[in-house]
């Protein structure tokens, strides 16, 4: 069969899907159909009957607006994505949302749409493949050996994150990463020459990539030769494919008119004629399905791999068991028992240390149990304290380590970690100053949306960092993280809460965790075993009154000690004061109503929240009758103790505010 007709099946489904939805992007799928046909039918190792096969090649559509391309590919090659699913493109509760979403249709490796993040996720996947191979493969036993392929457009390359990710990919020699640039010269505003005139091949050569320029994106032989050359080269490869957006559309191809709008019934009819595609909307002939189906070949490839793995298992039974545990995302045996013992030991041996140091101590204790840890920092390891005694850096020539030097690339780091998490086999953690989570925010949002494990260590969490001033002092960042759905945000007050936060982040497989730590030393709080257990509920009574409280002080992180001291003074003056430590508001909010009422009785309306972050967040806990000691402006450059005094974070101010409230 003429392979052009196999590519035309993608074009037909794409224009039909967009037309039926009356919205979407037909241009990119029609332009990249020939490349997709060559890659998916000739090179991609995958099994539609088992989309979770551990050693499958990964495919990422970074230009996610062209989602009908991947939906068409999944449908045609035999995944559980029916023609009715394609007809439901962009409709409520369909498996085919406007941009590809992880967890909806089988075979979607990552959620894409925010441009540049797909290529960055792909870099993470390629890093995970190379690291797993270095950790598990033995001579004659290559059980981890697959490619990561990514399609991307001009928009991805204009986004700054593509520089962060592709620069690092070149440095680390990710030879199993192959990217296709859809060089069609068109974006939403029109022809890109006016705003995107980079010499992209030279740019990628400068990163240390293997670049194959000027490939005709509509010539199957040229595309195939480029892929073969890419697979043979030890460097990551950029294949520059010259394509015509909306290929086949007589009146709209090559222009922005077909980028982000349906072609219209008349133009679709003309396109069918132009392409020689004589079938109705959503009609695919049986012989086309037969040519496209990857079920038989995919099952054979997985069966061959299963044989390889059985031989590996016979030769290296312990490694094989560990590989299975890690790719299944299971924690080691005795994890719960050992982790709880570590936490109990910390409570029994008080230390007044910065919570960033407590975080490093937790890494040291837990890391010995977790070979799946893949740590890192955006060039702040000595400040974030993310390296521990077992940390070994990844290098291009040796990927057997467990620590990535991301360089000053906060956004790139976070989206790469999403790719590592999606690939499987690792628990990634990264780090920067809390202030600079702003650079990475959208990648954390994507982790929350995809429900993937991404642990971020955010240190230097308030005006407490002092002299560096307001450019580096976070104010609104904690609230911003807490307001993100499916984000778990922790701001611990001492080494015990810090270890609990780490334990829960390691156990949390269905979303990201933001662990927020101080630069300055924090006093350890005394607790009973029951109180230690209650930390995991996100908020608990740390210090209680004799009898029913008349005032509740709610605090987090460095301000918990302040609340305790103020409570002691108020108690000495005859007031009944309860102190609630609330390291994780989202976790507290998930507790049952009875527990929340026990901690914050609704009839005790005299409440003060104390946190060196934006004040407004706390009204939901203190009510309009309560008071908040927090930040309402940016900080200043000065020693931390002077700043805490200036902004009202003193025992005296808490006591005076309490007296006013109780008067």
UniProtKB/Swiss-Prot annotation:
MF terms in GO: metal ion binding; transketolase activity
Gene name of this polypeptide: tkt2
Annotated site residues (Important for catalytic activity) in this chain: 25, 259
Transmembrane segments: none
Active site: 410
Subunit-level organization: Homodimer.
Family the UniProt entry places it in: Belongs to the transketolase family.
Protein name: Transketolase 2
Binding site for Mg(2+): 154, 184, 186
Pfam families xref list: Transket_pyr (PF02779), Transketolase_C_1 (PF22613), Transketolase_N (PF00456)
Organism: Vibrio vulnificus (strain CMCP6)
């Amino acid at each position: 069969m003429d392979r052009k007709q196999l590519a035309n099946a993608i074009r037909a489904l794409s224009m039909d899907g967009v037309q039926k939805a009356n919205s979407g992007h037909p241009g990119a799928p029609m332009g990249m159909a020939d490349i997709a046909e060559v890659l998916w039918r000739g090179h991609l190792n995958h099994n539609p009957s088992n989309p979770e096969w551990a050693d499958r090649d990964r495919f990422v559509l970074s230009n996610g607006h062209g989602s009908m391309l991947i939906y068409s590919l999944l449908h045609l090659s035999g995944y559980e994505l029916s023609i009715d699913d394609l007809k439901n493109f962009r409709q409520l509760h369909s498996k085919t949302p406007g941009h590809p979403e992880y967890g909806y249709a089988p075979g979607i490796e990552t959620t894409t749409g925010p441009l540049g993040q797909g290529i960055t996720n792909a870099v993470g996947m390629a890093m995970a493949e190379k690291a797993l191979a270095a950790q598990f493969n033995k001579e004659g036993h290559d059980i981890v050996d697959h490619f990561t392929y990514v399609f991307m457009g001009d928009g991805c390359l204009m986004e700054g994150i593509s520089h962060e990710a592709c620069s690092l990919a070149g440095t680390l020699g990710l030879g199993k990463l192959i990217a296709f640039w859809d060089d069609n010269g068109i974006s939403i505003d029109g022809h890109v020459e006016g705003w995107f005139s980079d010499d992209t091949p030279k740019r990628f050569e400068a990163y240390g990539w293997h670049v194959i320029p000027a490939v005709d994106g509509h010539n199957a032989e040229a595309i195939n030769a480029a892929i073969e050359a890419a697979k043979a080269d030890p460097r990551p490869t950029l294949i520059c494919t010259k394509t015509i957006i909306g290929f086949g559309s007589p009146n709209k191809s090559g222009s922005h008119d077909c980028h982000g709008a349906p072609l219209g019934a008349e133009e679709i009819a003309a396109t069918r004629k132009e392409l020689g595609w004589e079938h109705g909307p959503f009609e695919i002939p049986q012989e086309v399905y037969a040519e496209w189906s990857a079920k038989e070949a995919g099952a054979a490839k997985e069966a061959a791999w299963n044989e390889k793995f059985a031989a590996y298992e016979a030769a290296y039974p312990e490694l094989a068991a560990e590989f299975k545990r890690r790719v299944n995302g299971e924690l080691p045996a005795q994890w719960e028992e050992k982790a709880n013992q570590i936490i109990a030991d910390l409570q029994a041996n008080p230390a007044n240390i910065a919570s960033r140091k407590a975080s490093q101590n937790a890494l040291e204790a837990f890391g010995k149990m977790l070979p799946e840890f893949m740590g890192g920092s955006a060039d702040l390891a000595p400040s974030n304290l993310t390296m521990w005694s077992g940390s070994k850096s990844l290098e291009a020539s040796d990927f057997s380590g467990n620590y990535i030097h991301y360089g000053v690339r906060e956004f790139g780091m976070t989206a790469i970690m999403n790719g590592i998490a999606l690939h499987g086999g690792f628990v990634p953690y990264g780090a920067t100053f809390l202030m600079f989570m702003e650079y990475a925010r959208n990648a954390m949002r994507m982790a929350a949306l995809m429900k993937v494990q991404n642990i971020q260590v955010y240190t230097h969490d308030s005006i407490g960092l002092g002299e560096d001033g307001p450019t580096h002092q976070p104010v609104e960042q904690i609230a911003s993280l807490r307001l993100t759905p499916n984000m778990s945000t922790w701001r611990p007050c001492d080494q015990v809460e810090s270890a609990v936060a780490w334990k829960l982040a390691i156990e949390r497989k269905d979303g990201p965790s933001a662990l927020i730590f101080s630069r300055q030393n924090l006093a350890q709080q005394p607790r009973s075993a029951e109180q230690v257990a209650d930390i995991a509920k996100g908020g608990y009574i740390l210090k209680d009154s004799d009898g029913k409280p008349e005032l509740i002080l709610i605090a987090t992180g460095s301000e918990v000690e302040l609340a305790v001291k103020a409570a002691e003074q108020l108690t000495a003056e005859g007031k009944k004061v309860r102190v609630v430590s609330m390291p994780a508001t989202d976790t507290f909010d998930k507790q049952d109503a009875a527990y929340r009422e026990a901690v914050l009785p609704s009839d005790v309306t005299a409440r003060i929240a104390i946190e060196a972050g934006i004040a407004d967040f706390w009204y939901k806990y203190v009510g309009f009758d309560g008071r908040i000691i927090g930040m309402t402006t940016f900080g200043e450059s000065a020693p931390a103790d002077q700043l805490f005094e200036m902004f009202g974070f003193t025992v005296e101010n808490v006591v005076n505010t309490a007296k006013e409230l109780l008067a």
